[in-house]
Amino acid sequence: MNILRRQETSIESTADFQIGDQIRLGKYTATCQAVTNKAAIFLLDQYLDKAYRMNPTDTNRGGYARSELRHRIGNAGFVAKDDNFRAVRGRLIPFQNGDLLRIPTVGEIFGDDPFYERDGHKQWELMKKRCNRITERDEGEEYEHGWLWNKVQHGDAKSFFAAVSYNGDTECETATEIGGVRPVFQLAF
């Protein structure tokens, strides 16, 4: 028999993070999914309070990089306005594109899937369990789909993006659908 022991410590006194570490951000929690040589990558355990669409029109032209959703959550203004991120603002590291927050990729959640735009990411270890891919907006609400970064590649799919379904499988949704947003962010050591 194994014992899972949790020990609470302040984020200010932590020199490093491990996969599975959980932090509280206001009303949300976030779990460490990966550790690099300079940062820990966290994924919110819940969807943001508000559901968002990917784009105002049914198009995936430009991908996530040119989407309305990215422009809403990726910039420093969103983090500055959202009090839930107050505790970590000083430790956030921008991603390569300059964003402080982004949504996860198909690769990070499910591993490589040729049906979707390739992203070069490996599946996060914790995402190998379906229960870690499923989430809700508020405790007790029904599960819903949540956006992923990738465009659908095949057929006449000019308006579809990948999503995590309510049961933890991959699915695709049109860009104007309203869906859950589960931000990813990096914290410096």
List the model feature ranges, each with a label.
Residues 1-189:
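Collagenous Gly-X-Y triple-helix signature in extracellular proteins
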